[in-house]
């Protein structure tokens, strides 16, 4: 099973948009992607999730991020389900869904629990534009995902990469420091001195030398 920091395994998959090679299909376009699995088509919780992902698709695309679903179903099942969602709920699913009918990719990614039958759990893999796995989340089959948290996670990772900072709990609505971001702790005596000086000048704020934070530039 892959872990955070590893490259996403190279694999060609069947989808509702045709064959796709992962992660190259997105990496070559310079895009991040969120791969998420669902237990089965034509199930209530999964339907609410797909509608929710589609409603937030523009938010993901503004973050240069694509969506791709997966379940252990055949492609015709995906196509019929997507058709049903459009006809009954007036929501058109625009992103591809992987038809992992043999469960090979799901098995490789650790999406199948031996205690939950042959269907996937609700896994989420966030992969950056270099094809590196940046985050992995697992939800049980009986609980739908918090989709706003997945948007927040992608945004936080991208800001962290760009600015070299860390994000506090519930960023940008942290209980202690609000929408400010955390400066990585000093790793030398000289850095501690520099942090204290920067704090005295009002350039940053510190609760102590190891807990400093600032507004985003």
Curated annotation (Swiss-Prot):
Gene Ontology biological process: cell redox homeostasis
Enzyme class, spelled out: oxidoreductase
Positions of disulphide bridges: 206-212
Major location (coarse): cytoplasm
Catalytic reaction equation(s): a hydroperoxide + [thioredoxin]-dithiol = an alcohol + [thioredoxin]-disulfide + H2O
GO CC, alphabetical: cytosol
CDD domains xrefs: PRX_1cys
Residue numbers binding substrate: 122
Domain of life of the source: Archaea
EC number: 1.11.1.24
UniProtKB keywords: Antioxidant, Cytoplasm, Disulfide bond, Oxidoreductase, Peroxidase, Redox-active center
Subunit structure: Homodecamer. Pentamer of dimers that assemble into a ring structure.
More info: The active site is a conserved redox-active cysteine residue, the peroxidatic cysteine (C(P)), which makes the nucleophilic attack on the peroxide substrate. The peroxide oxidizes the C(P)-SH to cysteine sulfenic acid (C(P)-SOH), which then reacts with another cysteine residue, the resolving cysteine (C(R)), to form a disulfide bridge. The disulfide is subsequently reduced by an appropriate electron donor to complete the catalytic cycle.
NCBIfam families on file: PRK13189.1 (NF009668)
Family as reported in the entry's similarity comment: Belongs to the peroxiredoxin family. Prx6 subfamily.
Name recorded for this polypeptide: Peroxiredoxin
């Amino acid at each position: 099973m892959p872990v955070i920091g590893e490259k996403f395994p190279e694999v060609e998959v069947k989808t509702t948009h045709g064959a796709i090679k992962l992660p190259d299909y997105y990496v070559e376009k310079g895009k991040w992607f969120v791969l998420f699995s669902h237990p089965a088509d034509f199930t209530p919780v999964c339907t609410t999730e797909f509608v929710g992902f589609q409603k937030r698709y523009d938010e993901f695309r503004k973050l240069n991020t694509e969506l791709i679903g997966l379940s252990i179903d055949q492609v015709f099942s995906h196509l019929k389900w997507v058709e049903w969602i459009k006809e009954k709920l007036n929501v058109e699913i625009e992103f591809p869904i992987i038809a992992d009918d043999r469960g090979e990719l799901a098995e490789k990614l650790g999406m199948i629990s031996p205690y939950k039958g042959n269907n996937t759990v609700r896994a989420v893999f966030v992969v950056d534009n270099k094809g590196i796995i940046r985050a992995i989340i697992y939800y049980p089959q009986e609980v739908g995902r918090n989709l706003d948290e997945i948007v927040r996670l992608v945004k936080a990772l991208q800001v962290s990469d760009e600015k070299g900072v860390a994000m506090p709990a519930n960023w940008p609505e942290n209980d202690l420091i609000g929408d400010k971001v955390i400066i990585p702790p000093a790793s030398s005596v000289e850095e501690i001195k520099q942090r204290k000086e920067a704090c005295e000048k009002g350039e940053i704020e510190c609760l102590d030398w190891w807990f400093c934070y600032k507004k985003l530039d």
